[in-house]
């Protein structure tokens, strides 16, 4: 199958790198580091508040910072980084073109928009439900919408990874079995699909319910 995919050869490792995959790896890795820094900042605020001599934030801002810290450190940065690893372990290590790069960019866009929406909603107050957001804690509908969009984008990234493995197999870009790192990434992607999909499915009725409640309160 002929394609217009552009490659370069890494001067250090000698690996053949799909330029489209390289860009996706970079943007996902950068987004991961940015949200790790944001989450770390919120974590510092939480730590300074827990320090009795400082006690930086009042109670409402403490739980706001704790919620943002949990989301960015335990969810957003980890999954952005996982997407970068998945694209590296498939396209780069197997010397393959990435499957459906437009879908991969769409997934990244959804993840970025979702993460930004959730962070903004948390900073606006009224959504300090912490990372677990257990009942009866209730957040604004945008909080759940942002997480759902982020989850859908991550699922798209996982399926692009699976597709890239298929492309590499069909085009015989590697010999024998897949490398151990790629096998580990495959295992992580399978686990991610089940966990992310189940989380998103649970949040969809929650988002719809709270959106309906918000509409009733405003009417």
Regions found by a protein language model. Give the residues of each.
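Short, intrinsically disordered terminal tails adjacent to the first/last structured region
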Residues: 1-9
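N-terminal signal-anchor module of multipass membrane proteins
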Residues: 10-72, 76
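Membrane-interfacial loop-to-helix junctions in multi-pass inner-membrane proteins
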Residues: 16-33, 93-113, 136-147, 166-191
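Alpha-helical transmembrane segments of integral membrane proteins, especially early/N-terminal helices
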Residues: 27-43, 69, 103-121, 192-200
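Membrane-interface helix-loop-helix modules in multi-pass inner-membrane proteins
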Residues: 47-52, 57-58, 62-162, 206
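Hydrophobic positions within alpha-helical membrane elements
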Residues: 74-75, 194, 218
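Alpha-helical transmembrane segments and their membrane-interface junctions
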Residues: 125-126, 196-209
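Conserved small/polar residues in nucleotide/adenosyl-binding loops
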Residues: 210-217
């Amino acid at each position: 199958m002929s394609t217009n995919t552009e490659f370069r050869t890494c001067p250090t490792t000698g690996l053949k790198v799909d330029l489209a995959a390289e860009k996706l790896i970079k943007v996902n890795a950068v987004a991961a580091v940015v949200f790790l820094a944001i989450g770390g900042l919120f974590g510092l605020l939480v730590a300074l508040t827990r320090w009795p001599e400082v006690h930086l934030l009042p109670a409402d801002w403490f739980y706001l910072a704790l919620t943002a810290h949990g989301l960015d450190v335990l969810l957003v940065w980890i999954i952005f980084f996982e997407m970068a690893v998945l694209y590296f372990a498939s396209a780069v290590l197997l010397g393959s073109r990435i499957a459906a790069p437009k879908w991969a960019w769409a997934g990244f866009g959804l993840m970025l928009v979702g993460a930004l929406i959730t962070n903004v909603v948390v900073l606006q107050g009224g959504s300090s439900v912490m990372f677990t957001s257990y009942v009866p804690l209730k957040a604004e509908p945008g909080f759940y919408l942002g997480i759902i969009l982020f989850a859908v984008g991550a699922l798209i990234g996982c399926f692009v990874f699976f597709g890239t493995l298929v492309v590499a197999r069909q085009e015989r870009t590697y010999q024998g079995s897949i490398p151990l790192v790629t096998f580990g990434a495959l295992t992580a992607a399978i686990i991610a699909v089940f966990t992310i999909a189940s989380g998103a499915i649970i949040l969809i009725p929650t988002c719809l319910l709270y959106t309906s409640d918000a509409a009733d309160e405003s009417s």
